């Protein structure tokens, strides 16, 4: 109890330093939304949407919520998701010079393969500039006035700013801070932020798909103790292997240690558990449509049962 009270006081300090009060809220007109993560299992969901009829699903009140680099994929322009969210600082913290030349990013100096990552980030923003349908874009208030957000001057995109200040303390305190939009649960993964913001936006049912989260079985440690992670996404034919590196305090290149990696994964799933708790508190449904996967915080539903709720296209 004393620990929770201390965390409540500590969180108040964080809120005063990092959060903005009275951010404009957004209320979604739809009842149900599907958050489409980038895991391989999302392919089955997207293909089924195409066969049932994307516009048919939308007419029946279903909305789509995309994340991160989804706009780089052809499916983006067929699904035309109404909602989009980014959270990771790498999507926001770069200059005009880096946008024009990805190789100039400071991280690329110690992680040469980051140039490819930055190039894809740039392509993500360029694709968003081509959006010709109404879109609600959720952006952390910390980055609302950064270069790249200001660059995105597409009149079809409405920005909704949210506070990403991790809330700790007693359950009652956390609930009140969430209600007042002063912070959120730990969102080590962008999907958790989507779920949370969707609930705050009034959605009654939040479905998630493509949340494979099999990071822990896709790593190996090579002969010099470098962790190699294999990444797989629904839009890639080949899995990508890359070393997990970091920049040390002295500017040199270091290796991410195994305990650091698993500590991050613990935060991912702890965050999901907290979001699940809050969803129950405010009587919202969060349902996992991912076939397989390693997220155990939410109830599950098969794709067959999910699509069975909707009438088929004529």
Where are these regions (language model features)?
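Metal-ion/cofactor- or nucleotide/acyl-coenzyme-handling active-site neighborhoods
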Residues: 1-314
